């Protein structure tokens, strides 16, 4: 919103899982939602450079430069079936959406590996959610990412095809709903190469994670990213880690880049 990429109206209308709009949540927190909107400070930005820990194992040097942010989408898979008793319903008589979901999760894993992409079912909702009940509905959220838009679209199509075929076999239903799809962000090559030159040939690599830099790039601001090595390759976990020397190297790199850009 501050960058002008998302309108205040759309942002304030967004709801949480309980249906509470952002505007109401802000009011409940004592914040006036009418103050939400583009920031004049963003319009004053000539260039944005973000320093961030690398969130995988792709960087072997202390500091690297980003080439792009992979496109990624989040899709809601709704599997419908027939609720029934877990103890009395014969296995061959079931219309179990959990089984369809489970096979879809395996298909997503396989298809992502074949495409050199990423596919993750990280959130699940089950109805009636009883230990002794065959579910009537399973809702699962897929996070899919790839190096380019075509690969992402083909990945989703392959997963959906296998899920649909499995649903037909299981006597269940499937509905796939895109919830958000972010396009690829290619950082300006001239700016990227300038950073590489300042940093004496630092390695260049893409990232599969979303970043603030992507938003500023979408806002039309020349944007670049610096990464600090992550020896564990782990992110979104307490095990995420970077050596102090690498962190200091990252700070030095950012300072050198900003000094060069200020010339």
Region locations from a protein language model:
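Midchain, well-structured core segments that form catalytic/ion-binding scaffolds
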Residues: 1-150
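A short beta-alpha structural unit
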Residues: 120-130, 141-148, 173-192, 214
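Short secondary-structure junctions
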Residues: 111-119, 167-173, 199-202
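Alpha-helix N-cap and loop-to-helix initiation/capping positions
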Residues: 93-96, 187-190, 242-246
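A generic structural signal for tightly packed, nonpolar segments enriched in small/aliphatic residues
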Residues: 62-64, 79, 157, 190-194
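Zn-dependent metallopeptidase/amidohydrolase metal-coordination segment
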Residues: 136, 202-256
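Predominant activation on well-ordered alpha-helical scaffold segments within soluble catalytic domains
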Residues: 3, 23, 27, 76-77, ...
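Short amphipathic alpha-helices in soluble, non-transmembrane regions
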Residues: 154-164
């Amino acid at each position: 919103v501050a960058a002008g990429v998302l309108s205040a109206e759309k942002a304030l209308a967004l709801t949480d899982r309980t249906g509470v709009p952002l505007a109401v949540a802000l009011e409940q927190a004592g914040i006036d939602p009418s103050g939400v909107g583009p920031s004049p400070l963003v319009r004053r930005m000539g260039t944005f450079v973000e320093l961030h820990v690398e969130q995988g194992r792709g960087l072997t040097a202390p500091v690297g430069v980003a080439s792009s942010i992979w496109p990624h989408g989040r899709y809601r898979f709704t599997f419908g079936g027939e609720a029934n008793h877990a103890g009395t319903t014969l296995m061959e008589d079931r219309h179990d959406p959990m089984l369809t979901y489970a096979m879809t999760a395996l298909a997503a894993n396989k298809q992502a590996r074949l495409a050199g992409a990423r596919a993750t079912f990280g959130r699940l909702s089950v109805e009636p959610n009883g230990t002794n009940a065959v579910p009537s509905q399973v809702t699962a959220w897929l996070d899919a990412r790839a190096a380019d838009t075509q690969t992402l679209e083909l990945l989703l199509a392959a997963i959906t095809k296998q899920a649909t075929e499995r649903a037909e076999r299981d006597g269940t239903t499937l509905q796939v709903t895109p919830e958000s799809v972010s396009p690829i962000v290619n950082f300006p090559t001239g700016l990227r190469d300038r950073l590489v030159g300042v940093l004496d040939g630092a390695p260049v690599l893409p990232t599969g994670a979303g970043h603030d830099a992507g938003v500023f790039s979408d806002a039309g601001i020349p944007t670049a990213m610096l990464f600090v090595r992550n020896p564990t390759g782990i992110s979104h976990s307490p095990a995420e880690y970077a050596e102090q020397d690498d962190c200091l190297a990252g700070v030095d790199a950012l300072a050198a880049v900003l000094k060069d850009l200020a010339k």
